[in-house]
From Swiss-Prot:
<dbReference type="InterPro" id="IPR015813">
    <property type="entry name" value="Pyrv/PenolPyrv_kinase-like_dom"/>
</dbReference>
<dbReference type="InterPro" id="IPR018129">
    <property type="entry name" value="PEP_COase_Lys_AS"/>
</dbReference>
<feature type="active site">
    <location>
        <position position="578"/>
    </location>
</feature>
<dbReference type="GO" id="GO:0008964">
    <property type="term" value="F:phosphoenolpyruvate carboxylase activity"/>
</dbReference>
<feature type="active site">
    <location>
        <position position="144"/>
    </location>
</feature>
<dbReference type="GO" id="GO:0006107">
    <property type="term" value="P:oxaloacetate metabolic process"/>
</dbReference>
<dbReference type="InterPro" id="IPR033129">
    <property type="entry name" value="PEPCASE_His_AS"/>
</dbReference>
<dbReference type="InterPro" id="IPR021135">
    <property type="entry name" value="PEP_COase"/>
</dbReference>
<comment type="similarity">
    <text>Belongs to the PEPCase type 1 family.</text>
</comment>
<dbReference type="GO" id="GO:0015977">
    <property type="term" value="P:carbon fixation"/>
</dbReference>
<keyword id="KW-0120">Carbon dioxide fixation</keyword>
<dbReference type="GO" id="GO:0006099">
    <property type="term" value="P:tricarboxylic acid cycle"/>
</dbReference>
<keyword id="KW-0460">Magnesium</keyword>
<protein>
    <recommendedName>
        <fullName>Phosphoenolpyruvate carboxylase</fullName>
        <ecNumber>4.1.1.31</ecNumber>
    </recommendedName>
</protein>
<keyword id="KW-0456">Lyase</keyword>
<comment type="function">
    <text>Forms oxaloacetate, a four-carbon dicarboxylic acid source for the tricarboxylic acid cycle.</text>
</comment>
<dbReference type="InterPro" id="IPR022805">
    <property type="entry name" value="PEP_COase_bac/pln-type"/>
</dbReference>
């Protein structure tokens, strides 16, 4: 009899559903529970059979709901979305553990699998270890308007996950099982009685605190675990590597508190507070770990020996308790704790919760703390206690090297237009008669190069500048102060949004010079200047821009002297998609990478790409492993950064084990893409030509709908929740860059989020069907065979179709048609929705023909089962949301209806898992 591997998942979903149902019944009565069940069953009939009678019945039920009933229904299905996600995550952990326990071959996407592949290719373990000496792998957390999880909710969900995990790993006695059941009921009740939404709009500081919760839950402990596992695997394959300690190649960065592009609430004061909050979190973690370590290392002289360095460290400790005279390790740790507590006070101005034994000198730099911990490590290893050095001390030493006193590197980001205005104002006051804004590109570059070579600053303390200019200068001065206070890694990068020419980079360089972060006479540049190319046109021009930049001798000298001849370039997936559609965006990004690889190689500069990916496929999302391996050869080279945005952060890193698995996937993919890429054949020329032809048609189809169809803007605003998203207290940043309803001014995030909420997912697929249909008409003989060969042989094209497959499977035209019904102009509604419907069918037909699948997701049975399990509980939320939108737009002033809409947005985002 074949084992049903998904039976435990279904059991967990039933368990959580039953507990939630019991909670609803207890809190609101049998009638409320029966109503929710009736809606669920009717929705299932509607989804399963496209049953029009079920649709009419459902509309009748929803139309008759009172306001209070509506809130109960929305909350019930929203929380079930959250609970089913917990069950699914637990099942992934369960299956991974079963795989390891069975001793099966390493799974694709694991570090073990990557090492096996690399070793099989002939690379020795020592070469693999050396790879990490120059590697940099960094997921970067960003705060965006799709991040809808409250920390209170996350805490409840973490408790539920722990309870499920305990039931999984242990054989419980009847009494223990009863205690577990009661704890589960208590936690679900707490969840039900916890407000899902914030009463006020998030501040940036709130977003910082939310981001810090993932460090506490996952990163601070799981990164050291991952490093240790990787080191152990390398040593097991080559004993000569014993004692291997890899450099801090894997770091988790952050934009939260440093991203000023379109967010006026990110100020110098906020940046300073962010730095302090991060430092407080990491110092508190170190102090707690040291306290626990001191309790464990009770080794006594006479039973063990200790190194002279350790004895000297103990002698310098302010801990003179007679009870610890013969316990040098404890005394040494007490001394380290005292110095770290003093560092806490010096950096933050506050005492830690647990006071040291006495006052001590603070650490001047994190390297001093690392050196003291190394003394303990070496003494343990040299004196018969190596096993003790491999436990908590090893993890703490690793954490100190990764997180420093700053916790997470913060990127600064600002729009190039802001830099331009600030530079123009500074030049106008420092060089009378200079009108920078009127200069052409060549004149701008000449002037900026001249100013960069001039020692004097442009800014004068005697001039009153505009608020914008004062604010920007204050940010860079705060960054310089942060370098002195927390170390250079605290703020390593400055990113320029909307980069379109060389002057954009030089403008930032000039502003860095004003703050002392760039010192040309020393050939010193303290941060990376990172251009962000976002639109289709800017992506096409990116190689040319960097080529002309590298032709400037002064700039190249800075790279050679201060940046190790490495330059980072960020590529924007979100805006390029909104600009040109899914297919054209993906192709434009691929071509930009090929062009950049050639330019950087010609100039002898190492390329580091920063991928600005969102959670949804429409914003470059999708599985990280496939995405990294789909990069063109030479694009990774051991260095990669990528954004982790919106609700994806909670989904990927809310659970520690899931978080470690996701970090491992990024490391494994980077290892394979860097070391094995030259073994993959380059795509055939005819593949590239075909892709260009497909892109041209897809671009025309997408632009024709979104930007050239009269009334489309109105259709979008009336058929989606975009207006309501703008009201929701989610992120600190406005949904649009400018006031108004123009799609050009709308941020890519709420654009994609809105299409996800109405279940059309349009940015993730529209245009592909038209492109394939048109191209096949012109290549009737061998067209489909060529497309199938592209899918089979070219990882880029395969990943593109795999992501589209996922999005198409999550699309629901029947539900989307109900949202279309919100459009008041019937002719406009029918014309546009019919066009979208036809394109969806053409796209599905094209995808199935190319991949050879009979149904969507045949090649991804795991996701197919997940959708089958979860979506019957997600669909009712959409149906209720449509009814709520209808009522809201008729009344506008009903707070309970607004609340229901906002809760439904949260629940649908949770159910889709990658909607923003």
């Amino acid at each position: 009899m074949t084992e049903d591997k998904d039976a435990p998942l279904r059991e967990d979903i039933r368990l959580l559903g039953r507990v939630l149902g019991d909670t609803v019944r207890d809190q609101h009565g049998e009638a409320a529970f029966a109503l929710i069940e009736r809606i669920r069953q009717t929705s299932v009939r509607f989804r399963r059979d496209d049953d029009n009678a079920a649709r009419l019945e459902l509309e009748g039920i929803l139309d008759a709901l009172s306001r209070e009933q509506t809130i109960e229904v929305v909350r019930a299905f929203s929380y079930f979305s959250h609970l089913s996600n917990i069950a699914e995550d637990q099942h992934h952990i369960r299956r991974s553990r079963a795989h390891l326990i069975a001793g099966s071959a390493p799974r694709e996407g694991s570090v073990a699998h990557a090492l096996v592949r690399a070793l099989a290719s002939g690379l020795p373990p020592a070469r693999l270890a050396a790879f990490f000496d120059t590697a940099l792998i960094s997921p970067v957390l960003t705060a965006h308007p799709t991040e809808v999880q409250r920390k209170s909710i996350l805490n409840c969900e973490t408790d539920i996950a722990h309870l499920l995990d305990a039931r999984d790993r242990m054989t419980l006695t009847p009494e223990e099982r009863q205690e577990s059941d009661e704890a589960l009921r208590r936690t679900v009740l707490t969840l039900w009685q916890t407000r899902m939404l914030r009463p006020a709009k998030l501040s940036v500081v709130d977003e910082v605190a939310n981001g810090l919760s993932y460090f506490d839950a996952t990163f601070l402990r799981e990164l050291p675990h991952l490093y240790a596992n990787l080191e152990d695997q390398l040593v097991s394959r080559d004993p000569a590597l014993a004692g291997l300690e890899l450099p801090a190649f894997l770091q988790v960065g952050s934009w939260i508190g440093g991203d000023r592009d379109g967010n006026p609430f990110v100020t110098a004061d906020v940046l300073e507070r962010t730095l302090a909050m991060q430092a407080g979190a990491v110092l508190g973690f170190y102090l707690d770990e040291l306290h626990a370590l001191g309790a464990r290392l009770s080794l006594a002289l006479g039973l063990v020996t200790a190194s002279d360095a350790l004895l000297a460290l103990a002698a310098r400790s302010p801990d003179h308790s007679p009870h610890r005279n013969d316990e040098p390790y404890r005394r040494a740790i007490s001394g380290i704790y005292a110095r770290l507590a003093a560092t806490h006070h010096a950096l933050l101005g506050t005492e830690p919760p647990r006071h040291p034994v006495a006052v001590a000198e603070p650490y001047a730099a994190v390297a001093e703390l690392a050196d003291d911990l190394d003394v303990i490590h070496r003494s343990l290893v040299a004196n018969g206690s190596a096993a003790l050095a491999r436990g908590q001390l090893r993890r703490l030493r690793r954490a100190v090297r990764v997180f420093g006193f700053h916790l997470a590197p913060i990127d600064l980001r600002q729009n190039s237009e802001v830099h331009e205005r600030v530079v123009a104002e500074l030049l106008a006051t420092a060089r009378t008669g200079t009108d920078y804004a009127t200069l052409d590109e060549a004149a701008r570059v000449e002037l900026l190069i001249e100013e960069l070579a001039t020692p004097r600053p442009l800014a004068s303390p005697h001039v009153r500048y505009s608020d914008e200019t004062e604010g920007e200068l204050a940010i860079f001065r705060t960054a310089r102060a942060a370098h002195r206070r927390y170390g250079g890694p605290a703020i390593p990068n400055c990113i320029i949004s909307k980069t379109d020419d060389v002057s954009d980079l030089l403008e930032l360089a000039l502003l860095l010079k004003e703050a002392g972060l760039l010192r040309p006479h020393e050939r010193a540049l303290d941060v990376n200047i990172v251009p962000l190319f976002e639109t289709i046109e800017d992506l096409a021009n990116a190689p040319s821009v960097m080529d002309r930049l590298f032709a400037l001798p002064g700039y190249m000298n800075l790279l050679a002297a201060s940046r190790d001849r490495t330059h980072e370039v960020m590529l924007g997936y979100s805006d390029s998609n909104k600009d040109g559609g899914f297919l054209t965006s993906g192709w434009a990004l691929y071509k930009a990478e090929i062009g950049l690889i050639e330019v950087f190689a010609r100039h002898g500069i190492r390329l580091r790409l920063f991928h600005g990916r969102g959670g949804s496929v429409g914003r470059g999302g999708g599985p990280s492993y496939e995405a990294i391996l789909a990069q063109p050869g030479g694009a990774v080279q051991g260095q990669i950064r990528l954004t982790e945005q919106g609700e994806v952060i909670a989904a990927k890193y809310g659970n520690p084990e899931v978080g470690r698995r996701n970090l491992e996937v990024i490391v494994a993919a980077t290892l394979e893409a860097s070391l094995l890429a030259d073994r993959a054949p380059a795509p055939r020329v005819e593949f590239l030509d075909t892709m260009q032809a497909l892109s041209d048609v897809a671009f025309a189809a997408y632009r024709g709908l979104v930007y050239d169809t009269e009334g489309f803007e109105r259709y979008f605003w009336e058929s989606t929740v975009i207006s309501e998203i703008a009201e929701l207290n989610i992120g600190s940043r406005p949904a649009s860059r400018k006031k108004g309803t123009r799609i050009e001014d709308l941020r890519a995030i709420p654009w994609v989020f809105s299409w996800s909420q109405c279940r059309l997912m349009l940015p993730g697929w529209f245009g592909f069907g038209s492109a394939v249909k048109t191209w096949l008409a012109a290549h009737a003989d061998d067209g489909i065979a060529r497309l199938q060969a592209m899918h089979r042989e070219w990882s880029f094209f395969a990943a593109l179709l795999s992501n589209m497959d996922m999005v198409l499977a999550k699309t629901d035209l029947a539900i989307a048609s109900r949202y279309a019904g919100l459009v008041k102009d019937v002719n406009l509604r029918d014309a546009i929705f019919e066009r979208i419907r036809n394109e969806w069918h053409d796209t599905v037909d094209a995808l199935l023909a190319i991949t050879g699948q009979r149904e969507l997701l045949d090649g991804n049975p795991l996701l197919k089962r997940s959708i089958r399990n979860r979506f019957p509980y997600l669909d009712p939320l959409n149906h209720v949301q449509v009814e709520l939108l209808r009522r809201h737009r008729e009344t506008h002033d009903d707070a309970r209806i607004r609340l229901g809409i906002h809760i439904s947005i949260n629940g649908i985002a949770a159910g889709l898992r990658n909607s923003g």
